[in-house]
Amino acid sequence: MAEPRRVAFISLSPVRRREAEYPGPEREPEYPREPPRLEPQPYREPARAEPPAPREPAPRSDAQPPSREKPLPQREVSRAEPPMSLQREPPRPEPPPPFPPLPLQPPPPRESASRAEQPPRPPRETVRLELVLKDPTDESCVEFSYPELLLCGEQRKKLIHTEDPFNDEHQERQEVEMLAKKFEMKYGGKPRKHRKDRLQDLIDIGFGYDETDPFIDNSEAYDELVPASLTTKYGGFYINTGTLQFRQASDTEEDDITDNQKHKPPKVPKIKEDDIEMKKRKRKEEGEKEKKPRKKVPKQLGVVALNSHKSEKKKKRYKDSLSLAAMIRKFQKEKDALKKESNPKVPVTLSTPSLNKPPCAAAALGNDVPDLNLSSGDPDLPIFVSTNEHELFQEAENALEMLDDFDFDRLLDAASDGSPLSESGGENGTTTQPTYTSQVMPKVVPTLPEGLPVLLEKRIEDLRVAAKLFDEEGRKKFFTQDMNNILLDIELQLQELGPVIRSGVYSHLEAFVPCNKETLVKRLKKLHLNVQDDRLREPLQKLKLAVSNVMPEQLFKYQEDCQARSQAKCAKLQTDEEREKNGSEEDDDEKPGKRVIGPRKKFHWDDTIRTLLCNLVEIKLGCYELEPNKSQSAEDYLKSFMETEVKPLWPKGWMQARMLFKESRSVHNHLTSAPAKKKVIPAPKPKVKEVMVKTLPLHSFPTMLKECSPKKDQKTPTSLVASVSGPPTSSSTAAIAAASSSSAPAQETICLDDSLDEDLSFHSPSLDLVSEALAVINNGNKGPPVGSRISMPTTKPRPGLREEKLASIMSKLPLATPKKLDSTQTTHSSSLIAGHTGPVPKKPQDLAHTGISSGLIAGSSIQNPKVSLEPLPARLLQQGLQRSSQIHTSSSSQTHVSSSSQAQIAASSHALGTSEAQDASSLTQVTKVHQHSAVQQNYVSPLQATISKSQTNPVVKLSNNPQLSCSSSLIKTSDKPLMYRLPLSTPSPGNGSQGSHPLVSRTVPSTTTSSNYLAKAMVSQISTQGFKSPFSMAASPKLAASPKPATSPKPLPSPKPSASPKPSLSAKPSVSTKLISKSNPTPKPTVSPSSSSPNALVAQGSHSSTNSPVHKQPSGMNISRQSPTLNLLPSSRTSGLPPTKNLQAPSKLTNSSSTGTVGKNSLSGIAMNVPASRGSNLNSSGANRTSLSGGTGSGTQGATKPLSTPHRPSTASGSSVVTASVQSTAGASLLANASPLTLMTSPLSVTNQNVTPFGMLGGLVPVTMPFQFPLEIFGFGTDTAGVTTTSGSTSAAFHHSLTQNLLKGLQPGGAQHAATLSHSPLPAHLQQAFHDGGQSKGDTKLPRKSQ
């Protein structure tokens, strides 16, 4: 180990010589090692024999006792003589004898030793050193110095070869001395004096400090590099102690220089005072410059001026620092003193005396002279290598004088940016002023960008001139008012130019101002803002005056109010105290409350103040526009301005920033209106009632329905208005319930507006209409509820009969209320369910829609829950239509009602042909109305009316086909009411309905969520379970066929936005017929009436669609669809029921489909955003479920029945669940309101495989949706789940009751069932009304008379 170390330590040419003399490769290493020490301690190796002993002492010195492992050459051992030379210096003397020429070369000494005794000992060349290596610790580790080891060994050998090394005091002392010298050499001492002035000896007094230490603040400039000859006044490095005081570092000069420095700074100020301060600074800087110049030279040599980047900071410091300013003089004096010392030392430090002198001069002139490696050829050296120091200092003085005239600050700024200009400038500065300036100017001043405006260039020239004059006059304050004006003028012109040009101009200006570019830009921006603030000053003052003029009066009034209040309060307190002894505590409690309640400091604006405020804001906005980087939005910018600047103009507490913002909105609205628009967006929904019905999503539908509901109420003069006029959506449940009871008697007179969508949007259905619709739904015509939503505006006030029926239905249907809550969709759902129909239509509109849905669902749902669930082929649709016809003719009063409704619908459809939109709406409304009167008169709405009308033809067939028909109608009305209407009338019940149904199903998805859902469900049920829910129950084939027939009018629907829904409209008449046929099928006698209802619902939906040509839009379409959908939903529920009750495979299927459709439609109404197909299904599901429980069965019974159906109910159940969840949206809300919601769900599950359980589409009975509507979206429970849920709780009772009610309602006359919750048939008057509505589609608002 020692060997490697000696190699490291030893590197002396003398050693090599010695090696040459004595072959000893090892020694070579030794020498190299020794050289460092050899200079100080050239010793011989004679001690080798005893190396171990010396080693031990050495270890002490080194902190570890070394034993020599390597054999020392015998020569070394023989060099016992040198041992005396343990002391490094003494050895030097000895070495001379051996090698006088090379006293520093240990090899010669060794040779001398060898020459005496060991010339014969060449083996000596191999040195053995035994070194004891100790484990290193945190404090120390073993270090060996080969030369020292050799010395120690030799000395020991000579002096104490046999003695115990530890007992050798002499050697220990020598070792200690050696150590001291070693450290002296390494860390300081006199040798340093020689080097202290060399450029490379400039030391960084901050070196070694942790730059990242948060405690150390480097923000202020300090002289990082100072000559080694200088140290701080008290030694060390100070942080944040102000200007550093320097003193000579050498021990001898320390005290003198410290004194000098202490006294000199004051002297300098006395001498030069004001002027001197600048000169001092410049002189100091000049010193720096000279240092830098020298650094510059080094730069050329590869050394960079380390301090150049600190120049700016130093500049600042120098301005205030007298001691630093005097530093150069101190250096001069120091140099004089050093001169004498340095001359002898020159040879040691530098190879040539000339070189040595320059370094000293450099140190004297500047703190930062960086490099000692200046070769005599250095260009700048001659400056300092004058023959004598005096000349050198003289030159430095001249340079200082020159620098005094030079703008050092500017130079420093440039230096701070790292521009070589400062360095080279400084360098030249020391040499000659002209050179310096000539170099600085070109480098410092970047050229101006091309193509600047003439005015701008002129102003820049003005700035140049001003800066030049300023420099000549002496630096006092650069940024005078004139200078600021020039800069501001430049800045204002630069604002119009691009950022690149601006940056170029700033870089150019930087050369003329005493700050760097960043500071300049900040100053310009501040000037600009100050000017803007000046512009604000006057308007602010005016506003303040105006406020101060108005405030006294307002303050006086306020004080009067406060006095009056306090008097009243005191009086009250007294009375209270008299009354109660404990009044004091209560009074204390009251006092704060009264203070809060007390008179408000409300400022009353007048036009003058408002105008002044607006003017102020306008100016401030101009300032905002000028800001290059707008970190804040205009709104935040203005608010902060008002908070900080404007608000304080009022007495405290009299003004809020938000009021200022509000009052000045007219001025800043164009910038701050975006958020406002967002906030206002919700408000428009109610306004766009018609359009919204078409476009709004289901969730928005309730609101629309609510809004529309008042209109309907206005239209409906009968008691229905009273009962239904409750809160729009949520109150619709209660309203429907009330209306439901009153609706039964009023079944005969149901007035629905023909154009469900449009009119409903503008005219909310009256309570009468809603009640009638509910009654109709209760009677088993459950088609309207879904459509009723859309048709609500169109529905005209329904007669009292509907209200009575609705009231009765409501009382009977427990589920009605929850459905009503859903709002329009909810009401539809309730109506569909029949029992639920009543409660659903809290809003007249909602009631009407709900009623329609209920009516449709009641009949349809009972008959074929299954059918509703699965898509129905065209053939099935046709069969369903046929069955509907049969049912229509054969079914009891309800069937009759359905028939009449269907007939009306047919008529309506034809009328629609003429004026399809209106006719479709009216038809749908009529159908719905009929259904409502039968099932849920309260729900009768424009949609109901349409449904009623459409039902007129296919009332009986409603179970399957009618539902489809309704869906078609709805869809078509929504998209293109007229066109669809016509196709509906045109297609034969079987044929048209079939064809159009698929389209309808598709259309529904196209339409808005609620409408879409309705339409989709209808279409899907029309094809599988679209609107057929009600009729679907009647005949399973019919459900398939009927919905498909509805699709037949597809061509017509295709014109509409939703292709599928559109066909449904056109197929409406067909569907009605089909529905009738479907209803007729024996499997579903009840279904017949139900079919009729669905047919009506279809009509209503169609009407709705017609009314909202934008049926595709979630809102409008949804509404119209929802009514039909709701009808379907009850149908779905019933469909589940009928399969259980009159289980007929085809019938069941049909019913199921029907129910599915209704549920979907209902849900659709609920969740308008849902795709049309799913949406309509959802809608129908919601309506269906509600209707089923309430409408089909009496109250709870209806709900229970759908539950009963396990197969379809599974679908229904899913729907029901979905409906429940969706009820809050629209159709779902209906379902949720109705306790039998689950029941509806089961029909949904049962009815439609397609209908995947959607949480939202619970009530939405998935119809066999020809259009693949993603029911999953709504989260219908699985079909099975739906069944389970329904049957689990109220499924058995509800399903049974619902089925019974639906069947009964459908079979008996609509009036009968109106009285009974689930009367499947629409009241005669309802049917008539629907029919009339269908005929006068244009007059959607005309009340319909019951035929």
Swiss-Prot record:
Tissue specificity: Expressed in several cell lines tested, including primary and transformed cell lines.
Q: Where is the composition biased (Polar residues)?
A: 823-832, 985-996, 1101-1164, 1174-1185
Give a yes or no for keyword Ligase in this entry.
no
What are the record keywords, sorted?
A: Acetylation, Isopeptide bond, Phosphoprotein, Ubl conjugation
The covalently linked position for Glycyl lysine isopeptide (Lys-Gly) (interchain with G-Cter in SUMO2), per the record, is K272
Q: Where is the composition biased (Pro residues)?
A: 93-110, 1046-1060
- Which stretches are tagged as biased composition: Low complexity? 721-740, 880-911, 1035-1045, 1061-1070, 1077-1095
Which residues are recorded with the post-translational modification Phosphothreonine? Answer: T243, T252
Task: From the UniProt entry, list the residue stretches annotated as the region Disordered.
Answer: 1-134, 250-301, 573-597, 707-740, 815-849, 880-913, 981-1006, 1035-1218
Q: Which residues are annotated as modified residue Phosphoserine in the UniProt record?
A: S13, S250, S311, S416, S419, S422, S584, S1123
Q: Which GO terms describe its cellular component?
A: extracellular space; nucleoplasm; nucleus
Listed as disulfide-bonded, the cysteine pairs are none
GO biological-process terms attached to the record:
chromatin organization
Q: Where is the composition biased (Basic and acidic residues)?
A: 16-37, 67-79, 122-134, 574-584
Highest taxon of the lineage: Eukaryota
User: N6-acetyllysine occurs at which residues?
Assistant: K1068, K1148
Tell me its family: Belongs to the ubinuclein family.
Q: What is this protein identified as?
A: Ubinuclein-2
The organism named in the record is Homo sapiens
**Taxonomy-wise, where does this protein's organism fall, top ranks first?**
Eukaryota, Metazoa, Chordata, Craniata, Vertebrata
| Name of the gene | UBN2
